[in-house]
From Swiss-Prot:
It comes from the Eukaryota. The modification Pyrrolidone carboxylic acid is found at residue 1. Gene3D superfamilies: 1.10.530.10. GO terms for cellular component: extracellular region. It comes from Casuarius casuarius (Southern cassowary). Keywords: Antimicrobial, Bacteriolytic enzyme, Disulfide bond, Glycosidase, Hydrolase, Pyrrolidone carboxylic acid, Secreted. GO terms for molecular function: lysozyme activity. One of its GO terms (biological process) is defense response to Gram-positive bacterium. It catalyses: Hydrolysis of (1->4)-beta-linkages between N-acetylmuramic acid and N-acetyl-D-glucosamine residues in a peptidoglycan and between N-acetyl-D-glucosamine residues in chitodextrins. Belongs to the glycosyl hydrolase 23 family. This is Lysozyme g.
Length: 185
C-alpha cells in the first residue's frame, strides 16, 4: 500500500517557477517545465526504481512522490559529488540536511531513502496537526513544502511555497511526481 498520505494525481499544481526552469535551459515554466526536468532525470531515476518502490511500500508513501523529491533535490544523483550536494550540507538522493539530521547509509541506498522518506512523513504529520481540516492531498502537498522549508513556513494552502527554494518547491515536486506516476512509479 502506498496511499496512506494521499493520492498525488489529485493534487493541484502550478509546477516549476521560471527561476527553477531557467538553469535547466528551459524558456518556459510551469507544469510543462517540471515534466521536462523529470523526463531528463528518468534514466538515472530508473536505476533506483526498485528501491524507491520498496521504500514507498514499506512506509506507505507514494513512490512517485519520493521520485519527485529525488528529481528536485539531486537530479536522481546527477547533481551530487560523492553523494553530497548543497555545499556539503545535503546528503544523498533526497538531500538529508546534516545540520538537522544525522545522515545514515549509502547516499543512494535503502537506509538513506528510508530516512529521507521518514523525514517527509514527519513533516506531513506536522502539517496534519497544524491544518486538520485540509484534505489528505492538501496535507501531503503541505508536507512536501515543509520537507524543504520546515512546517513553520507553511501558513496557508495557497501560499505554502513562498519561502521555499525558488518559491515553488511543492508545486514543482508534485508536478514531477505526477510525471513519474505515469512512468510506473
Amino acid at each position: 500500500q502506498t496511499g496512506c498520505y494521499g493520492v498525488v494525481n489529485r493534487i493541484d499544481t502550478t509546477g516549476a517557477s521560471c527561476e527553477t526552469a531557467k538553469p535547466e535551459k528551459l524558456n518556459y515554466c510551469g507544469v510543462a517545465a517540471s515534466r521536462k526536468i523529470a523526463e531528463g532525470d528518468l534514466q538515472s531515476m530508473d536505476r533506483y526504481k526498485t528501491l524507491i518502490k520498496k521504500v514507498g511500500q514499506k512506509l506507505c508513501v507514494d513512490p512517485a512522490v519520493i521520485a519527485g523529491i529525488i528529481s528536485r533535490e539531486s537530479h536522481a544523483g546527477k547533481a551530487l559529488k560523492d553523494g553530497w550536494g548543497d555545499n556539503g550540507n545535503g546528503f544523498g538522493l533526497m538531500q538529508v540536511d546534516k545540520r538537522s539530521h544525522t545522515p545514515v547509509g549509502k547516499w543512494n541506498g535503502e537506509r538513506h531513502l528510508t530516512q529521507g522518506t521518514e523525514i517527509l512523513i514527519s513533516m506531513i504529520k506536522k502539517i496534519q496537526k497544524k491544518f486538520p481540516r485540509w484534505t489528505k492531498e492538501q496535507q501531503l502537498k503541505g508536507g512536501i513544502s515543509a520537507y524543504n522549508a520546515g512546517s513553520g513556513n507553511v501558513r496557508t494552502y495557497e501560499r505554502m511555497d513562498i519561502g521555499t527554494t525558488h518559491n515553488d518547491y511543492a508545486n514543482d515536486v508534485v508536478a514531477r511526481a505526477q510525471y513519474y506516476k505515469q512512468h510506473g512509479y
